[in-house]
């Protein structure tokens, strides 16, 4: 073999080695990023899950002791919201503005899943005519991730009740409307409605806009209502709102088994890891075969 041929083979080997090293580094970085994304998705899901807060849930047995512990951790905690037949079973907070708890948990820690919070313009004791609450739509059925399901009439009809714990007392919730609107709807998202005529007009607006309603729930301008608002999964600027009447009587929870929260953002990643690994191993085998061919030709 003459000198030019040897130089060519050495050059090919050097280029091959450089390419192999570069591609391997890229693959390792992608795998590292995938592992981090998997861990991060798990953290978001864990922070959003209602089970994280179960130990703080106020009950008749503990007379709110555990709830008071959560309030000691974060004084902005003011209530507990439960919607029967769903995973909506969370403490509720109120900040100085409506941005405070978009990325902050009920424990006051940074969290992409945020917290369920009452509009800063509302009275903290829920004494207003309309009390507006917000929460993220999570695909894992966490936070307000199940609100959109109330657009289905059978789902809406099956889940009529909930309860609200505030100032050491429990109130019943009777859901009577599901509304879809836009984030900029000033009529729906206004508070401090004092005049009786304005209150009735507000109720009429809700019923006119509602996709689903419950005729057996009588709501008047004298009542108090609560709106559970979240982002619509079908529209960037859309908002899905479940509306309930706040009452003195508390209905029992007819649901013994609630559909479990499932983190869809995590599971597909796990499912794809074997395929990714198979592709990586295939590439390595291919590069090894190529290197052997070069050596044989040498």
Task: Give names to the regions the model predicted.
Residues 13-28:
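Sec-dependent N-terminal signal peptides
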Residues 1-16:
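N-terminal Lys/Arg-rich, disordered targeting/topogenic segments
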Residues 21, 31-298:
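Solvent-exposed, non-transmembrane regions of membrane-associated and secreted proteins
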């Amino acid at each position: 073999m003459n000198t030019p041929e040897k130089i060519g083979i050495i050059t090919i080997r050097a280029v091959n080695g450089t390419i192999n090293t570069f591609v391997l580094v890229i693959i390792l970085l992608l795998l590292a990023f995938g592992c981090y994304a998997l861990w991060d998705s798990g953290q978001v899901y864990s922070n959003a899950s209602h089970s994280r807060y179960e130990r703080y849930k106020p009950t008749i047995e503990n007379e709110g002791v555990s709830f008071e512990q959560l309030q000691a951790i974060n004084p902005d905690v003011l209530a507990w919201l439960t919607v029967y037949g769903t995973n909506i079973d969370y403490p509720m907070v109120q900040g100085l503005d409506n941005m405070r708890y978009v990325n902050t948990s009920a424990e006051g820690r940074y969290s992409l899943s945020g917290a369920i919070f009452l509009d800063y313009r509302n009275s903290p004791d829920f004494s207003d005519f309309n009390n507006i609450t917000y929460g993220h739509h999570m695909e894992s059925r966490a936070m307000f991730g199940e609100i959109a399901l109330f657009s289905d009439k059978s789902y809406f009809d099956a889940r009529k009740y909930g309860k609200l714990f505030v100032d050491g007392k429990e109130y019943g919730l009777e859901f009577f409307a599901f509304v879809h609107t836009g984030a900029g709807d000033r009529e729906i998202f206004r508070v401090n409605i004092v005049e009786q005529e304005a209150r009735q007009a507000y109720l009429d607006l809700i019923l006119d806009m509602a996709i689903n309603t419950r005729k057996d729930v009588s709501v008047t301008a004298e009542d108090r209502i609560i709106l559970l608002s979240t982002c619509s999964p079908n529209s960037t600027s859309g908002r899905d709102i479940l509306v309930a009447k706040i009452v003195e009587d508390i209905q029992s929870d007819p649901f013994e088994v609630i559909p479990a929260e499932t983190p869809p953002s995590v599971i597909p990643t796990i499912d794809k890891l074997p395929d990714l690994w198979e592709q990586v191993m295939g590439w390595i085998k291919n590069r090894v075969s190529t290197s052997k061919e070069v050596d044989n030709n040498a």
